[in-house]
Amino acid sequence: MKIIVFGITHKKATIDLREKVAFSQSKKQEAYSLLKESPFIHEAVILSTCNRSEVFAVVQDTSIARRWFKRFYTDFFQLKETALEGCNHFEKGREAVQYLYHVCVGVDSLVIGEDQILGQVKEAHAEALDFAATGKILNKLFLEAVTTAKEVKTETAISENALSISSIAVKQMENHLKGLVGKTVLVVGFGKMSRIAIENLLCKGIKRLYICNRTKESVQELIEKHPQIHYLSYDQKYEMLNGVDAVISATGAPHFIFYKEDMEKIYQKHRPMCMIDIALPRDIDPAVKEIEGIELFHIDDLKEIANENLAYRMDCIEIIKQSINEAIEKYEGWYQCLPIYPRIQAIKAYSETLTDQELEKLFKRLDHMAEEDRQVIEVVVKSLVKKMWKTPILQLKDAGIRGNGEAFAAFVDEFLGLDAGCGK
């Protein structure tokens, strides 16, 4: 079995392509069904964010898996045959393991060191568990990668000066409007990215903040705490455009929610407006930027601000990589021993059965012996047997880590006179 990862990220793929291959919730359900049906895929976890669309998997044959996943993406998302050329990535074995650790720490993010990706990885793993698509190999990998990421983030403070996509959007807005004090802002959506944006906006001295969401109940607590916050129903989003200085949109809609044709009918040019779209798929029709008076930004336009404080965070990366390599060595040791564990359990079961049988024979011959004395003998014999097996079992584990566990197991069988198939 081999661990692989296939997909696309912000490093090679444009936002147009990332938008096409984003796994919505409904698409995830369908995708997991297909992944579970495939004879080539034994375990799978889908990681889909605004900057990446990837599948981590356990496969038997990496060459077949690479071709299979390329075809899967092309067919599932109805892409042209050449759509993924030059912009997909594929890692296998240690490289795939290392890649996930880097993703969790934020080394592979648009914003180096950002924290949001760690939560997204945890959610992706939880979803895979819900769909019964993952197993012991990826479960162990994701849990270890998340744990290591938390530790190294604390040790190195790589996230200390990092920004999230949402906070970068607010900073872009602040730069474009030359300050946010006294401004009026509309935030569309109330998911995690929207809430982070709202937290940042409330620190900027804005005059009024409108939150547009399908239900008022979810934002009621914020409204009660902050008098400058007002609720808008989803149907009112266009009506407010002429009364705000800026818009941040971050919904989970699978289609545009702001269209050029509709905005042209409503938007009045008496005041310029900044619109920032941090959703994927995008919320705002890219053609909106053609409307006079409107400045439109999407995720890929935020890279310059994302690189602020980058030098400090890059200094942390070498320390992080060392910690990650140590964690990977530990995981790979566990992974290499997977074929050995059944043999170890079989050896233990064999020795326990043999010990119990011999003790039973002994106690039948010594039926006059007091129960207390029997217990003493049983404890001593079982302890002795356990000690005798300790070194062979440790050697078997070490052999597994070195990659020659099966050969060593066969030697142990022959040397100790066990059945050749006791570990199968």
UniProtKB/Swiss-Prot annotation:
Q: Which residues form the active site?
A: C50 (nucleophile)
User: According to its UniProt record, which reaction does this protein catalyse?
Assistant: (S)-4-amino-5-oxopentanoate + tRNA(Glu) + NADP(+) = L-glutamyl-tRNA(Glu) + NADPH + H(+)
**Domain of life, per lineage:** Bacteria
Q: Does the keyword Acyltransferase apply?
A: no
Please tell me where NADP(+) binds in this chain. G189, F190, G191, K192, M193, S194
Keyword field: NADP, Oxidoreductase, Porphyrin biosynthesis
Q: Where does substrate bind?
A: T49, C50, N51, R52, S109, E114, D115, Q116, Q120
Q: Which GO terms describe its biological process?
A: protoporphyrinogen IX biosynthetic process from glutamate
* GO molecular function per UniProt: glutamyl-tRNA reductase activity; NADP binding
* Metabolic or biological pathway: Porphyrin-containing compound metabolism; protoporphyrin-IX biosynthesis; 5-aminolevulinate from L-glutamyl-tRNA(Glu): step 1/2
Alphabetical list of Pfam families matching this protein: GlutR_dimer (PF00745), GlutR_N (PF05201), Shikimate_DH (PF01488)
EC no.?
1.2.1.70
EC category name: oxidoreductase
Could you tell me which SUPFAM superfamilies the record lists for this protein? Glutamyl tRNA-reductase catalytic, N-terminal domain, Glutamyl tRNA-reductase dimerization domain, NAD(P)-binding Rossmann-fold domains
Could you share any additional remarks the record makes about this protein?
During catalysis, the active site Cys acts as a nucleophile attacking the alpha-carbonyl group of tRNA-bound glutamate with the formation of a thioester intermediate between enzyme and glutamate, and the concomitant release of tRNA(Glu). The thioester intermediate is finally reduced by direct hydride transfer from NADPH, to form the product GSA.
Q: What does this protein do?
A: Catalyzes the NADPH-dependent reduction of glutamyl-tRNA(Glu) to glutamate 1-semialdehyde (GSA).
Q: How does it assemble?
A: Homodimer.
Tell me which NCBIfam families the record gives: hemA
The domain section of the record reads:
Possesses an unusual extended V-shaped dimeric structure with each monomer consisting of three distinct domains arranged along a curved 'spinal' alpha-helix. The N-terminal catalytic domain specifically recognizes the glutamate moiety of the substrate. The second domain is the NADPH-binding domain, and the third C-terminal domain is responsible for dimerization.
Q: Which family does it belong to?
A: Belongs to the glutamyl-tRNA reductase family.
Question: Under which name does UniProt file this protein?
Answer: Glutamyl-tRNA reductase
- The scientific name of the source species is Alkaliphilus metalliredigens (strain QYMF)
Q: What is the lineage of its organism?
A: Bacteria, Bacillati, Bacillota, Clostridia, Peptostreptococcales
The gene coding this protein: hemA
